[in-house]
Amino acid sequence: MLEDLKRQVLEANLALPKHNLVTLTWGNVSAVDRERGVLVIKPSGVDYSVMTADDMVVVSLESGEVVEGHKKPSSDTPTHRLLYQAFPTIGGIVHTHSRHATIWAQAGQPIPATGTTHADYFYGTIPCTRKMTEAEINGEYEWETGNVIVETFEKQGIDAAQMPGVLVHSHGPFAWGKNAEDAVHNAIVLEEVAYMGIFCRQLAPQLPDMQQSLLDKHYLRKHGAKAYYGQ
């Protein structure tokens, strides 16, 4: 079942250590098949060096039950499920503890848009969620992690299609895209702009956000109705 999607998810997961987005097994990638109502995700605790397509786990999008697979799905599966349910345009999700994005998350700080590298992928400030409550932490923690992400987007009026990433306060980044490969691409860029942002803040602590017109130009020429840009 879903052999092609399993291979795509495997390759996307293997890209995480290749791009220095994970240490040990700290990360996961999934992809969704909305017609079948399932997602495919990395197994829990399996080293990337020995992971195979057969290790990928197929999970019901609605119930969270394992549909196919001989290993336990990632512990972050409930977060992935909730995000797929809340954001119907996304097809792949990545969660990492990449160093610089996690620094911003642990500081509880959003990443401001100060340059065109950021604007080419993220249409504005990359948000950081609020701290989770004691009830959320002690309850269905991974599910509530998804809820706090969705709450952040709803309260701030952010379109997940235009903002393919978020920082979870005190935790780390999630990124998404049209498929697993695209989600990894966005996670790579998120880590890069997080790195740039730290040094920008050190060099110019009062640095304002980039011009709105420049943000619009760079984002919309790649993603707008009249997109034309490509390198």
From Swiss-Prot:
InterPro entries: Aldolase_class_II_sugar_metab, Aldolase_II/adducin_N, Aldolase_II/adducin_N_sf, AraD, AraD_entero. Binds 1 zinc ion per subunit. Coiled coil: none annotated. CDD domains: Aldolase_II. Its EC number is 5.1.3.4. Substrate binds at residues 27-28, 44-45, 74-75. The active site is at residues 120, 229. It catalyses: L-ribulose 5-phosphate = D-xylulose 5-phosphate. Zn(2+) binds at residues 76, 95, 97, 171. GO terms for biological process: L-arabinose catabolic process to xylulose 5-phosphate; pentose catabolic process. GO terms for molecular function: aldehyde-lyase activity; L-ribulose-phosphate 4-epimerase activity; zinc ion binding. SUPFAM superfamilies: AraD/HMP-PK domain-like. Its cofactor is Zn(2+). Involved in the degradation of L-arabinose. Catalyzes the interconversion of L-ribulose 5-phosphate (LRu5P) and D-xylulose 5-phosphate (D-Xu5P) via a retroaldol/aldol mechanism (carbon-carbon bond cleavage analogous to a class II aldolase reaction). Homotetramer. This is L-ribulose-5-phosphate 4-epimerase. It comes from Salmonella typhimurium (strain LT2 / SGSC1412 / ATCC 700720).
